[in-house]
Amino acid sequence: RGLGDVYKRQRLSSIKAAYNLGANAWVLNAGADSWTLEMADGAVMNGDSQEHIKEAIQVMSAYCDVLGVRTFPKLVDRDEDYNEIMFNKVKELSSVPVVSLESATLHPLQSFADLITIAEKTGYTPGTKPEKKVKVVMTWAPHPRRLPQAVPNSFAQWFSKVDWVDFTVVQPKGLELDPKFTDGATIAYDQDEALKDADFVYAKNWSSFENYGQPNDGDKDWEVTMDKMNL
């Protein structure tokens, strides 16, 4: 079996997983290890792009049994990013199953790994009902650069639906995530109060969904300190 990957920093864990399953894996960084790809349908190929994504993905998927793809948002046009134009184009053109190694809005493998880790750490047995729910808090934290929403979107999407977890998302006003991913979670704005008695704290930065792509790196009060971890 062969797994072809188009992505960057996710590579080691995905390659290891492929090897564990008895598959061969190789990596192609689009634009670095290959020609620059043209995305637009019907484009005249007389610009800077040397190859069209239509031909590239069709050929790559012919060589693979599974195609792992990682894409990133531009954080400029929310509709463009949240419509997952790049990732959906790959799915449309591929003749084999496509696995998301992260897209413009979601990072499902990361959230799956996080869920497994927390279940292992708590000793939770799937299918059972714990005496007390595990309190998991995802808190916004400052960062010097504006970061995508894919990781927190997926984390919220998964943990808000887990019946053995009491899940809270806490952030400054104006940095709420897309409600379709946080539905079922407790939404809070007081970090100290939210962190009280937490079993797990997931500190993550994300740029604004409402004022799309805008950072909020000035809130140093939102740094997760040891004092806050001990609340």
Predicted regions and their residues:
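Short, small-residue-biased leader/transition segments that mark boundaries at the very start
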Residues: 2-7
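Phosphate/diphosphate ligand-binding glycine-rich loop within oxidoreductases
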Residues: 14-119
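Short, structured coil segments at secondary-structure junctions
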Residues: 21, 93-94, 163, 181-183
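Charged helix-capping and loop-helix junction motifs
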Residues: 51-52, 83-84, 150-154, 185, ...
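Short internal alpha-helix immediately C-terminal to a glycine-rich phosphate-binding loop
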Residues: 111-139
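Short, conserved loop/helix-junction motifs that constitute active-site signature segments
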Residues: 129-131, 160-162, 228-231
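Conserved anion/nucleotide-ligand pocket segment
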Residues: 136-170
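Rossmann-like adenosine-cofactor binding region
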Residues: 180-231
